Design a protein with these regions (language model features):
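A beta-hairpin/wing motif
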Residues: 24-40, 57, 76-95
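Residue-level marker of intrinsically disordered, low-complexity segments enriched
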Residues: 6-10, 29, 33, 46
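A short, well-structured alpha-helical segment
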Residues: 26, 37, 41-74
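Acidic, low-complexity proline/glycine/alanine-rich linker and hinge segments
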Residues: 1-23, 59-69, 95
Length: 95
């Protein structure tokens, strides 16, 4: 039985749709970089890409990223911090 495992997402929050984008029917996405902690939480989210820019998708994605939960990376039975993890949040209108 292996004592090693890689990080796996166990909870992905739904970001709040930016109000201005929602009322104008705008769709988009944002990519956030996070550090996964030894306990599977995340810290230090940074928006690295937003499309289209200026509609609030990046800000909403950063807020949602703080609620991401992972099973942490484990090496020799010990949780490891994992930097530079990218997560893409998509914003799509209900059809």
């Amino acid at each position: 039985f292996s004592r090693d495992s890689d990080y796996i997402p166990v909870y992905i929050p739904q970001p709040q749709y930016p109000r201005r984008a929602q009322t104008r029917g705008k769709e988009g996405y944002a990519v956030v970089e996070v550090i996964i902690t030894t306990t599977g939480g995340v810290r230090d989210p940074v928006m690295v890409e937003e499309f289209p820019e200026g509609w609030g998708f990046g800000r909403a994605a950063v807020k949602a990223a703080l609620k991401l939960k992972y099973n942490p990376r484990v090496v020799d039975g010990v949780g490891q911090e994992v930097p530079n993890v990218l997560y893409k949040f998509s914003f799509q209108m209900e059809k």
